[in-house]
């Protein structure tokens, strides 16, 4: 289930001491970073939830990227163009 977090400090605490995050659950430790033209999204998979934090400020996004612990893998995903894909039959 997805869960959006709007506070930076709460998102950063998920890496440290939360029973739901991979740090204590023994799961795969991966942070997905999806960058579009305007918004950067950070996604952290927990045991129960997929935590998402998004920001439009590139300085904040760079700070969060630098703050990701070395124990986590960081996978960067480039966003698609803003044009919608058409369905072909």
UniProtKB/Swiss-Prot annotation:
GO biological process: protein-RNA complex assembly; translation
InterPro entries noted in UniProt: Ribosomal_eL38, Ribosomal_eL38_sf
Signal peptide: none
A Pfam family annotated for this UniProt entry: Ribosomal_L38e
Domain of life per record: Eukaryota
Disulfide bond sites: none
GO MF annotation, one: structural constituent of ribosome
Keyword field: Ribonucleoprotein, Ribosomal protein
GO CC, alphabetical: cytosolic large ribosomal subunit
Family note: Belongs to the eukaryotic ribosomal protein eL38 family.
Protein name per Swiss-Prot or TrEMBL: Large ribosomal subunit protein eL38
The organism of origin for this protein: Tetrahymena thermophila (strain SB210)
Gene: RPL38
């Amino acid at each position: 289930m997805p869960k959006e977090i709007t506070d930076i400090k709460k998102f950063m605490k998920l890496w440290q001491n939360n029973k739901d995050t991979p740090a204590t659950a023994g799961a795969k430790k991966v942070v997905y970073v999806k960058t579009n033209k305007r918004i950067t999204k950070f996604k952290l998979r927990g045991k129960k939830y997929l935590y998402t934090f998004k920001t439009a400020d590139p300085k904040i996004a760079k700070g969060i990227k630098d703050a990701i612990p070395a124990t986590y893998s960081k996978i960067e995903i480039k966003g698609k163009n803003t044009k919608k894909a058409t369905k072909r039959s």
